[in-house]
UniProtKB/Swiss-Prot annotation:
Subcellular location field: Cell inner membrane
Matches recorded under InterPro entries: ATP_synth_F1_ATPase_gsu, ATP_synth_F1_gsu
Gene3D superfamilies with a match to the protein in the record: 3.40.1380.10, ATP synthase, gamma subunit, helix hairpin domain (1.10.287.80)
Family: Belongs to the ATPase gamma chain family.
Protein name: ATP synthase gamma chain
Organism of origin: Bacteroides fragilis (strain ATCC 25285 / DSM 2151 / CCUG 4856 / JCM 11019 / LMG 10263 / NCTC 9343 / Onslow / VPI 2553 / EN-2)
């Protein structure tokens, strides 16, 4: 059985850890509140913008967009979103798992034809360990999502796609649903996927309600870059909010575990102390009878 001093030292150590996890939980909770507000304000706009675009592109109009062109995939770009720091449960591990699965599907293209754009320190480090060369560092975008940085990344991807330097772009990120639920998504970014609206009863309905000037082609040309830039920004906001939610939950669980451990150690301390007192009394009684 451990001595009183050893048990007391363990109790103090766990109490110190509990203070840290509790403080980290409060910080993460505050950041989550801010990030949640940003994503909740942005999502309706992004979804509406995307719906307008898909309605235009899928309507019976004599318009074609180069961003919708399907071609054989010879070169692919993968944009994966993670966090810059750890202590957020399985958040980064899940991103890495899906990233490895995605890379595995394109392995036959050859490593030189798989371009990786890591948004976040953790996925960037993992990419380097796997032997890939990251196409830039976007840690700031993961920590504090900025529309300007997101738009710059989107512009780069669009240019590469138009120049046929890449044939497909995929996104891997967490979608924030609630404090306890963050859904890991893998989405095709380019070419634009219209399959989701093929069976939409309202397909093309929005277009018929508008007079398009100067032309549908010009409107789509102006709208697509905005939608694609907004998509990267929204994914960054989604990932950021999901990270803080995962960290808040992880620190809450760690704090609860610390409380349980302190209770168990306190019981052990009291039991050990009681046993020590009993032994001393027995020694005293035994000495007086000798």
């Amino acid at each position: 059985m451990a001595s009183l001093k050893e048990v007391k030292t363990r109790i103090n150590s766990v109490q110190s850890t509990r203070k840290i996890t509790s403080a980290m939980k409060m910080v993460a909770s505050a950041k989550l509140h801010k990030a949640q507000g940003a994503i909740e304000n942005m999502l309706p706009y992004q979804r509406k913008l995307n719906k307008i675009l898909t309605n235009f592109l899928s309507a019976d109009l004599p318009v074609e967009s180069p961003f919708c062109v399907e071609r054989p995939v010879k070169r692919v770009a993968i944009v994966a979103f993670s966090s810059n720091s750890s202590l957020c449960g399985a958040f980064n591990a899940n991103v890495l798992k899906m990233f490895l699965q995605t890379v595995g599907e394109y392995r036959e293209l050859g490593q030189d034809n798989i371009l990786i754009y890591p948004v976040g320190k953790k996925i960037e480090e993992a990419v380097k360990k796997l032997g890939f060369f990251p196409q830039g560092s976007y840690q700031k975008l993961a920590d504090k999502p900025s529309y300007d940085e997101a738009a710059a990344l989107a512009k780069l991807l669009m240019e590469l796609f138009l120049e046929k330097n890449i044939d497909r772009v995929e996104l891997i990120y967490h979608h924030f649903k609630s404090m306890g639920v963050q859904e890991l998504l893998r989405e095709r970014y380019l070419p634009i996927d219209l399959s989701a609206v093929q069976n939409d009863e309202e397909r093309g309905g929005v277009v018929n309600d508008y007079i398009i000037e100067p032309s549908a082609a010009q409107l789509i040309a102006d709208l697509i870059p905005q939608v694609l830039s907004q998509k990267i920004f929204t994914a960054a906001l989604d990932s950021n909010a999901s990270e803080h939610a995962a960290r808040t939950l992880a620190m809450q669980i760690a704090t609860d575990n610390a409380n349980e451990l302190i209770q168990e150690l306190t019981k052990q301390y009291n039991k050990t102390r009681q046993q020590a007192i009993t032994n001393e009394l027995l020694d005293i009684v035994g000495g007086s009878m000798a």
